[in-house]
């Protein structure tokens, strides 16, 4: 009796790493050596008009290797992990059907997790419900809404700080829209990714070197016109500091400076510190990641290592 044969799952490559670790440089090199198409996995690169502070690939880089899922939202618009998973799966299918390999590059680890493991069946954002919650917050304050969440979903309330309006808003919204708590819904597992995924994490082994690069990059952004970029957003009038776009590292600190809440030197210091904290959180995610190949961003053989694994 002939054994049944099953179609081999298509390949995909994850290239993960903290900010300023050299992901883009390696991705560009891989684009030259492999039949790959790059998909950005970055919650900041999705926004139009936010180029300098996000270290978005330049026009020359994009001409040589186009990146999908960048510049797809206005800074006033929301974009969730569920939105990313939907869009990424669509892009991956198109790339695979063209006989090429999706190369997913970035540092938004929640997006990678959502794509790899699937998502719990959480409801989509509801503008009317959100507006109602925000109006209530203006009246009674977020502390009172946190106490309300403590009654509805104590487990989520214990995880969410009273001064984190974005997560607090989402937890309440989920309950009011679905009738189920965030804790209940997140226990339901999602659909795993139907690809053979080669996972790589690129990091500088010397933490001091990473910190040096972060500071250097921040100063380069300032020299490139970061203040003007944020002042353009600031002047629009429809954006505020609690929006996900303005909460991006660097933008929030520059926003405070433009609002005359801090001086220039303090803004620079806080921006660099916030970027270092982001890198630390990204590294914490990566240390708990399974089946990942570690790459030293300062090792010239990193490219060869990826090529060897993917070609095996």
From Swiss-Prot:
Catalyzes the transfer of a dimethylallyl group onto the adenine at position 37 in tRNAs that read codons beginning with uridine, leading to the formation of N6-(dimethylallyl)adenosine (i(6)A). Monomer. It comes from the Bacteria. Its EC number is 2.5.1.75. PANTHER family: TRNA DIMETHYLALLYLTRANSFERASE. The record marks 108, 130 as: Interaction with substrate tRNA. This is tRNA dimethylallyltransferase. ATP binds at residues 17-24. Substrate binds at residues 19-24. The keyword Magnesium applies. It catalyses: adenosine(37) in tRNA + dimethylallyl diphosphate = N(6)-dimethylallyladenosine(37) in tRNA + diphosphate. Its cofactor is Mg(2+). InterPro entries: Dimethylallyltransferase, IPT, P-loop_NTPase. It comes from Sodalis glossinidius (strain morsitans). Belongs to the IPP transferase family. One of its GO terms (biological process) is tRNA modification. GO terms for molecular function: ATP binding; tRNA dimethylallyltransferase activity. NCBIfam families: miaA. Residues 42-45, 166-170, 247-252 are annotated as: Interaction with substrate tRNA. Keywords: ATP-binding, Magnesium, Nucleotide-binding, Transferase, tRNA processing.
